[in-house]
Amino acid sequence: NVENTGATYAGKEVVQVYLSKTQNGLDKPYQELVAFSKSDLIIPNENQNMTLSFPVSLMASYCEEKACYIIENGKYILRVGNSSANTIAVATLVVEKDIVVEKCNNILSIDCDMAQIKPEGVSIEEATQYKLIIDDTKIQTKVNSYQQERKEITNNVTEKITIEDVIAKKYTLDEMVAQLTVKEMAELCVGTERSDDNSVIGAASYNVPGAAGDTSSILKESRAVKNLILADGPAGLRLQPHFVTDKDGNILKGGEGFNGTFLPFENVPEDAVHYYQYCTAIPIGWSLAQSWNTDLLNKAGQIIGEEMEKFNIDLWLAPAMNIHRNPLCGRNFEYFSEDPYHAGKMAAAYVRGIQSKGIAACPKHFAANSQEPPNGSGRAVCS
């Protein structure tokens, strides 16, 4: 129950649930965020009942030796508060034996000796008011399958398969791909492959000025596979605000470019057409995450999705959701949080808002990208 004890102003509060895991084996933090929720606007002297839950699988920790997530036997202290620095123990969850919840493979094993940093002993108080025994018989083990070498696909179909045939389930996508030439498959991987002076990283689209790029149109006529237009983010759509075409629709050089550069439009004919692509400036990820409001992130995503529809963008290269690991990382402002659960929930809400408009999002960047500039010489050792 959340109550506004003030006398003047209405406000909102964030209820956060943390879990202090048993410390009898695998190394674990003092407490981990496992659930949170933002209240409605509460006027003075009013209150709101809030219900939070989390999957039991979040009680697990990863064991590199066994390559699996394990809920170790012991006591788990459930905490509730409004920040990681302000929690109280409300319940004790008891696990009577080790439970394997997910089996994996170690695919990023470290290649060097690494001394583990151990904190000095921290006392973990136990909640004595409420105790719950976890029923291990109701927890299923998830087994991950990893892609092995694929067998060669042969195709004896003489008819040229189009993407419409695949959508209609007349043929499979594998059967269509098996008909492609090496050149067609290669061009699909490199996109438009621009080499002129208008090709700029982050703004290389043929079709929408300022967009990041396009996938290849090599299969558009032959197999009805339309090319996709990608726009960068994550603080809204990054497009060229103003561009000019001739009467035949050919885009003229000039206008605002990447990183605020500007080139004047030259030799503009009298019958030229001026186009404008002004997009909403959405607050950056770090600011959005501080709201702890997934509904707000969803609405921001809907704004992005609507503008993508308007400007014919198929895929937004965002949100950015790397974990804040180093305060000197040059792109921390783009990322949500140093907490993985918090960052994941924020990003998921954002993407759901975008997808509600039938548009796609592409979360980024590569895992453990914690250095910029320069971003081409960093070394990430993962456990």
Regions flagged by a language model, labelled:
Residues 1-61, 68-86, 104-383:
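Glycoside hydrolase catalytic-domain context in secreted enzymes
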Residues 86-105:
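Short beta-strand elements
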